[in-house]
Amino acid sequence: MHEAQIRVAIAGAGGRMGRQLIQAAMAMEGVQLGAALEREGSSLLGSDAGELAGVGKSGVIVQSSLEAVKDDFDVFIDFTRPEGTLTHLAFCRQHGKGMVIGTTGFDDAGKQAIREASQEIAIVFAANFSVGVNVMLKLLEKAAKVMGDYSDIEIIEAHHRHKVDAPSGTALAMGEAIAGALDKNLKDCAVYSREGYTGERVPGTIGFATVRAGDIVGEHTAMFADIGERVEITHKASSRMTFANGALRSALWLKTKKNGLFDMRDVLGLDVL
């Protein structure tokens, strides 16, 4: 990797998250914006990435070819869609580039491809790059160990109208954190929809509810409900910049890593809590 600064390439440069990542990369000390990518045929190709993100000229031109910019970055940051991310993953694996992956909605085969690639390159793969969300995941583990065996657990998440996967990756990570603390597999205890005559709630399950509306950046609540009381642990994001800063922080953290699969809790050192 480049010794002076970590050079990053950003996928989906013209999207909501891509623009935030460009802004964060241009503002963060120790980070250099090396490349910005968009899909082939995009009207944004040839634009200056900084101007596209509204922060002034950067000198980095939006391109569609990873091959053309392979010498301009050390870490590839991807918050796009699974099919595109897996294509980028194969390229980064071939060329020894680190990756920060914030894409959600992978199937089991996609997740396995990421695990296999991490044997050769360093990857931070997280459902959410917010510091607050990752602190929340740790709190959920602790709450589950105390209340999980006797309370009803429900996870409610809300996002903007354009989000294409449900439940959100963060909601699933919350469920996995809770299930893991209870020595369960989320696949065996998750309930993702309720409609019509459902009968009484099955003890030991983890329910999910999804809201898609307006421009909600992201809201997540885990409820531990018993008779007479309930505990709710909530995180609300008001700006995507919190995710962008977390992703750039992860890229900096990867500078000393040659290979391995990590998540945001590794970056933040939350295992000590």
From Swiss-Prot:
Assembly, per entry: Homotetramer.
Role this protein plays: Catalyzes the conversion of 4-hydroxy-tetrahydrodipicolinate (HTPA) to tetrahydrodipicolinate.
Binding site for (S)-2,3,4,5-tetrahydrodipicolinate: H160, G169, T170
Enzyme Commission (EC) number: 1.17.1.8
SUPFAM superfamilies in the cross-refs: Glyceraldehyde-3-phosphate dehydrogenase-like, C-terminal domain (SSF55347), NAD(P)-binding Rossmann-fold domains (SSF51735)
Cell location: Cytoplasm
Protein name in the entry: 4-hydroxy-tetrahydrodipicolinate reductase
Catalyzed chemical reaction(s): (S)-2,3,4,5-tetrahydrodipicolinate + NAD(+) + H2O = (2S,4S)-4-hydroxy-2,3,4,5-tetrahydrodipicolinate + NADH + H(+); (S)-2,3,4,5-tetrahydrodipicolinate + NADP(+) + H2O = (2S,4S)-4-hydroxy-2,3,4,5-tetrahydrodipicolinate + NADPH + H(+)
Catalytic residues (positions): H159, K163
UniProt keyword terms in alphabetical order: Amino-acid biosynthesis, Cytoplasm, Diaminopimelate biosynthesis, Lysine biosynthesis, NAD, NADP, Oxidoreductase
UniProt GO cellular component terms: cytosol
Residues that bind NAD(+): G12, A13, G14, G15, R16, M17, E38, G102, T103, T104, A126, A127, N128, F129
Family recorded in the similarity comment: Belongs to the DapB family.
Gene Ontology molecular function terms on file: 4-hydroxy-tetrahydrodipicolinate reductase; NAD binding; NADP binding; oxidoreductase activity, acting on CH or CH2 groups, NAD or NADP as acceptor
Pathway: Amino-acid biosynthesis; L-lysine biosynthesis via DAP pathway; (S)-tetrahydrodipicolinate from L-aspartate: step 4/4
Binding positions (NADP(+)): R39
Top EC class for this record: oxidoreductase
